[in-house]
C-alpha cells in the first residue's frame, strides 16, 4: 500500500525546498523512509509475503543509494536528513 496524497504532500512540504519539490534527494529519502516504515508494520503481520518483501528490499536499496549520493555531494544535508528521519547511519 502506498502513502496517501496528504501524507506525501506533508513530507514534501517538510523536506522540500518548496511545495512542488519532489525530486530532491532529501524528499525522495523521506518518502522512501515513510513507505518502508509503513511496510514494516505490514510484514510484522504477514510474514510469508515474499513478493512484497522483495519490493521492500528494493526500496531499502534505493534509499541507501540516495543516502550515499547525498553524503558524497553534500555532507551537511546528509547529516541533517538522517538526524531528522532518525536513521542510524
From Swiss-Prot:
Top-rank taxon, per record: Bacteria
Keywords: Ribonucleoprotein, Ribosomal protein, RNA-binding, rRNA-binding
SUPFAM superfamilies assigned: S15/NS1 RNA-binding domain
InterPro entries named in the record: Ribosomal_uS15, Ribosomal_uS15_bac-type, uS15_NS1_RNA-bd_sf
A GO cellular component entry from the record: cytosolic small ribosomal subunit
Transmembrane regions listed in the UniProt entry: none
GO terms (BP aspect): translation
Gene Ontology molecular-function annotations: rRNA binding; structural constituent of ribosome
NCBIfam families: S15_bact
Similarity remark: Belongs to the universal ribosomal protein uS15 family.
Assembly with partners or alone: Part of the 30S ribosomal subunit. Forms a bridge to the 50S subunit in the 70S ribosome, contacting the 23S rRNA.
Function: One of the primary rRNA binding proteins, it binds directly to 16S rRNA where it helps nucleate assembly of the platform of the 30S subunit by binding and bridging several RNA helices of the 16S rRNA. Forms an intersubunit bridge (bridge B4) with the 23S rRNA of the 50S subunit in the ribosome.
The name this protein goes by in its record: Small ribosomal subunit protein uS15
Provenance organism: Actinobacillus pleuropneumoniae serotype 5b (strain L20)
Amino acid at each position: 500500500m502506498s502513502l496517501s496524497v496528504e501524507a506525501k504532500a506533508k513530507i514534501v512540504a517538510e523536506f522540500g525546498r518548496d511545495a512542488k519539490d519532489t525530486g530532491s534527494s532529501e524528499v525522495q529519502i523521506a518518502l522512501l523512509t515513510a513507505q518502508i516504515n509503513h511496510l514494516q508494520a505490514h510484514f510484522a503481520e504477514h510474514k510469508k509475503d515474499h513478493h512484497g518483501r522483495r519490493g521492500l528490499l528494493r526500496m531499502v536499496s534505493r534509499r541507501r543509494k540516495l543516502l550515499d549520493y547525498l553524503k558524497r555531494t553534500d555532507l551537511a544535508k546528509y547529516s541533517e536528513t538522517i538526524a531528522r528521519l532518525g536513521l542510524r547511519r
